[in-house]
């Protein structure tokens, strides 16, 4: 079918155009454009991913900057004799790509909380602290404290260099197959009020 100027009318619009081979562009040209577009997309995606994986990004929200960041700065993970600092993503974002993507999707819930103001005041944050802590402890238990083990390893620890109490606790942890978070809650942030015996395990 042609219009009054003799041009063919497209049936089905954009879907039809996508289904039929192009008479104007070569397959090679389309392929090159697709590859370049893919590289640009992947580069942009990876840049955004890394930008959201920094301590600066984490504390850019006043909820984190005003509540947990000041208490983290008082811990051994912030300042210590070796000069090695564990930042927010070191503990809260997995390093391997698959688990990192899962965590980023989970973080969208936190972004929603920011938008609706779930913890936008110190009082609201404290009211939710136990819930937030329990969620993070459960995540760490489920992953066998994977992020802790990026820096710490029971197998690499020299027990004869540890204090007697620490040596005994780590030996028990090995025997009972415990994960780091079972004993080290509150290592980087204040423990929430209202914890139960169940939370202590």
From Swiss-Prot:
GO cellular component: a single term: plasma membrane
InterPro entries: Cytochrome_c-type_ET (IPR051174), Multihaem_cyt_sf (IPR036280), NapC/NirT/NrfH (IPR024717), NapC/NirT_cyt_c_N (IPR005126), NapC/NirT_cytc_sf (IPR038266), NO3Rdtase_cyt_c_NapC/NirT (IPR011885)
Family label: Belongs to the NapC/NirT/NrfH family.
Protein name: Denitrification system component NirT
Induction info: By anaerobic conditions.
Site residues, Interaction with NrfA: 175
Record key words, sorted: Cell membrane, Electron transport, Heme, Iron, Membrane, Metal-binding, Transmembrane, Transmembrane helix, Transport
Residues exposed to the Cytoplasmic side: 1-24
Major subcellular site: membrane
Domain of life, source organism: Bacteria
PANTHER family: CYTOCHROME C-TYPE PROTEIN (PTHR30333), CYTOCHROME C-TYPE PROTEIN NAPC (PTHR30333:SF1)
Post-translational modification: Binds 4 heme groups per subunit.
Positions with a binding annotation for heme 4: 180, 183-184
Binding-site residues, heme 2: 88, 91-92, 189
Residues that hold heme 3 according to the record: 148, 151-152
GO molecular function: electron transfer activity; heme binding; metal ion binding
Listed transmembrane segments: 25-45
Periplasmic compartment segments: 46-201
Membrane topology summary: Single-pass membrane protein
Binding site for heme 1: 58, 61, 64, 110
Native source organism of the sequence: Stutzerimonas stutzeri (Pseudomonas stutzeri)
Coiled coil (UniProt feature): none
Gene Ontology biological-process entries: anaerobic respiration; denitrification pathway
Subcellular location: Cell membrane
Ligand binding (substrate): 104
């Amino acid at each position: 079918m042609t219009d009054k100027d003799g041009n063919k009318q497209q049936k089905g619009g954009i879907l039809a155009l996508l289904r039929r081979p192009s008479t104007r562009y070569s397959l090679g040209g389309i392929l090159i454009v697709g590859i370049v577009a893919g590289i640009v997309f992947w580069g942009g995606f990876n840049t955004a991913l890394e930008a959201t994986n920094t301590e600066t990004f984490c504390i850019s929200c006043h909820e984190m900057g005003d509540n947990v960041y000041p208490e983290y700065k008082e811990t051994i993970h912030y300042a210590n004799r070796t000069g090695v600092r564990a930042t927010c993503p070191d503990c809260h974002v997995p390093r391997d790509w698959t688990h990192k993507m899962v965590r980023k999707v989970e973080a969208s819930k936190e972004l929603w909380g920011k938008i609706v103001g779930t913890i936008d005041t110190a009082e609201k944050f404290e009211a939710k602290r136990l819930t937030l802590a329990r969620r993070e402890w459960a995540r760490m238990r489920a992953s066998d404290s994977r992020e802790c083990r990026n820096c710490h390893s029971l197998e690499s620890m020299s027990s004869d260099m540890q204090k007697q109490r620490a040596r005994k606790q780590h030996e028990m942890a090995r025997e009972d197959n415990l994960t780091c978070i079972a004993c080290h809650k509150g290592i980087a942030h204040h423990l929430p009020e209202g914890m139960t015996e169940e939370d202590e395990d």
